[in-house]
């Protein structure tokens, strides 16, 4: 009887562990990180985060837990292999809901891709959700050394603002480091759409990363790295080479409106570049293909620390009309076909209105009164006005490339000389 009991108890410890959601639980390392080696492991981790209770952690850095500290879900994970989600519909890890609990789930742990990639990501609109991506909401958390290869992330803002990106929908007091994406990210007029994250709030940052995926938002905020950036956020040493319907690094920054009262400062966009044919003096600099290759090789793909936490393997290369960019594996590169303007099309969306640039003026003809927003090539809103029907002119803008966005869906790039 004792032997039978012994073997029964042993079986409890060696048999695979399944969650209430049906996925196999991954093992943990000595530091408590879950070791993710399959799609089932990643689903299990997602479900654990989304179902876990928030805990109060020392978010203000004073070494104590007090009422000023935020609550987050602090689970940690590492990828130990490339993951293929197979195009199955993905529910994001965490959820942003404008700070409203209990619907909000703030991922505040560490997620280290360790130089691996996730393929087959497929995120589709979900009723009531405001944030879309591999992660819906990263708050006080870190995502690093991770690539998103292919796949689609799509949102549809029926009930208000939505935030959509390949890595995260919303980033707040969190960090994205050493990441890249080639996914297609798309949304609608009310959304903020970015190649890596939809929005950045508070003291959040993205560094040493790039986007080579398409970002689509014909009449709303769109950026190659982030769709929206708050005044305390920062983007450092980041690059965009994917097609974007407006903006290049950041689609919009909310500090633009509050700057008028002097209450905020501009967000920090430092050493950021995008592949473009023309540009103006902005926070992010447009580079020709050859200059882009030189810069990204010097600043992103050169290891400053002799291998310590440096995931990139290889150098960017320009051959004919194709730009090749390295990933974490020398046998796998991202190829970007070049055209005259890879970050914006001449006419992004067609509408009932007519827009053109004449002698340094933006001339607009509309059939009815409507609002218009002018965005510079770095993605910052530089002017917002309401037009009457008929013919109108906008003057006083500096020379450069702008995206003119009308509320009827018209979105056109113009060059002021």
Predicted region positions:
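Short, glycine-anchored, charge-dense loop/turn motifs used at functional sites
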Residues: 375-382, 402
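Short beta-strand/loop motifs in extracellular/secreted proteins, especially
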Residues: 368-373
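Hydrophobic loop/turn residues within beta-sheet-rich immunoglobulin-like superfamily modules
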Residues: 138, 367, 396-398
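C-terminal tail/sorting-segment detector
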Residues: 3, 346-349, 399-417
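Bacterial Sec-dependent N-terminal signal peptides
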Residues: 1-24
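Surface-exposed repetitive/solenoidal architectures
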Residues: 21-345
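Glycine-centered tight-turn motifs at strand-turn-strand junctions
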Residues: 381-397
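Residue-level detector of functionally pivotal "anchor" positions at catalytic/ligand-binding pockets or at interdomain
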Residues: 336-361, 366-367
């Amino acid at each position: 009887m004792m032997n039978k009991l012994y073997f029964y108890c042993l079986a409890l410890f060696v048999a695979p562990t399944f969650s209430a959601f049906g996925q196999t639980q991954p093992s943990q390392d000595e530091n408590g990180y879950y070791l993710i080696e399959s799609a089932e492991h990643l689903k299990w981790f997602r479900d654990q985060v989304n179902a876990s209770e928030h805990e109060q952690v020392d978010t203000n850095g004073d070494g104590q837990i007090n009422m000023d500290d935020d609550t987050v879900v602090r689970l940690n994970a590492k990828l130990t292999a490339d993951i293929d989600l197979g195009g199955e519909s993905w529910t994001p890890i965490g959820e942003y809901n404008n700070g409203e609990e209990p619907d909000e789930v703030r991922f505040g742990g560490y997620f280290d891709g360790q130089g691996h990639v996730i393929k087959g990501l497929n995120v589709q609109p979900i009723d009531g959700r405001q944030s879309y991506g591999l992660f819906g909401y990263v708050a006080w958390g870190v995502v690093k050394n991770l690539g998103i290869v292919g796949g689609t992330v799509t949102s549809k803002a029926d009930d208000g603002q939505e935030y959509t990106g390949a890595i995260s929908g919303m980033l707040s007091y969190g960090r994205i480091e050493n990441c890249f994406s080639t996914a297609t990210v798309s949304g609608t007029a009310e959304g903020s759409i970015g190649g890596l994250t939809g929005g950045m709030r508070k003291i959040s940052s993205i560094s040493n990363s790039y986007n080579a995926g398409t970002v689509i938002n014909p009449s709303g905020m769109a950026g190659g790295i982030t769709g929206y950036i708050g005044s305390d956020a920062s983007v450092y040493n980041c690059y965009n080479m994917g097609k974007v319907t407006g903006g290049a690094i950041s689609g919009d920054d909310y500090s633009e409106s509050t700057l008028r009262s002097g209450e905020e400062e501009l967000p920090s966009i430092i050493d950021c570049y995008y592949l473009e044919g023309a540009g103006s003096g902005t926070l992010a600099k447009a580079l020709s293909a050859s200059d882009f290759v030189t810069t990204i090789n010097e600043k992103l793909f050169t290891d400053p620390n002799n291998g310590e936490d440096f995931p990139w393997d290889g150098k960017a290369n320009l051959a004919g009309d194709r730009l090749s960019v390295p990933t974490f594996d020398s046998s796998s590169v991202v190829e970007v076909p070049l055209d005259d303007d890879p970050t914006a099309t001449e006419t992004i969306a067609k509408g009932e209105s007519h827009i053109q640039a004449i002698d340094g003026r933006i001339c607009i003809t509309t059939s009815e009164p409507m609002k218009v927003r002018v965005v510079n090539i770095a993605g910052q809103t530089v002017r917002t006005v309401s037009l009457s029907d008929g013919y109108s002119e906008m003057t006083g803008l500096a020379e450069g490339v702008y995206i003119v966005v009308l509320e009827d869906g018209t979105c056109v790039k113009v060059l002021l000389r």
